[in-house]
Amino acid sequence: MVKRIAGPKHLLILVCLMMVAVIGVGSNLTLMPEASYQSVAEHTQYQVEAGERFAPRAVIQGGRSDDWQQVGEAINFGYTTDTHWYRVRLENPSGQTRERVLEVDYPLLDHIEFYEVRNGEIRDQALTGDQHPFSSRPLRHRTFVFPVELTPNGTTEIYLRVTTEGSHQVPLALWKVDAFFEANEKDVVGRSMFYGMLAIIVIVNGFLYLVLRERSY
């Protein structure tokens, strides 16, 4: 005798779970006040700027609202010279203004336009990238870091326009300000130790070569 595996109730539960999963993808990124770090990619949408340049205000004010697609788990389009627009909505459910930094953790992107938008109006913007002066970066850092102000009980939209000649990958993360600088200090210490050890190895090998005249050193 064969047992019934999936009755109407089971099918209904399965459909509900699938709907929840779909709704979760591309939804607003809700700020977690105690979280030091939040991943952004799964809440990000994109569209490709084909042909003539899109006017930023047209994109921001919904002139191309039908062209947005969901990114997925990571933003990586390989080697392409196509310009991509990215959009993420950051929701602050608390009654306090929250300060965050949005990091693009890939320092080889040529051109990045950043727009912080509330109620359809551009509140802040920046133009930076690997092909721009280091002083163009909102924060002096090896990656691209943008301060973001999240108003109480409100939604802030972030738009990025990215163009590059190399690998088009845009790893995004939202950090608490103090947590970002703490992680950065640890990263600097780790890199300093690595390069310090590398320098010691080079010096020792150079000294041994001068003493022993062995090419293997």
Regions found by a protein language model. Give the residues of each.
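Proteins with a high burden of low-complexity, intrinsically disordered sequence enriched in S/T/G/P/A and R
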Residues: 6-8, 23-25, 208-216
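Core alpha-helical transmembrane segments of integral membrane proteins
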Residues: 182-217
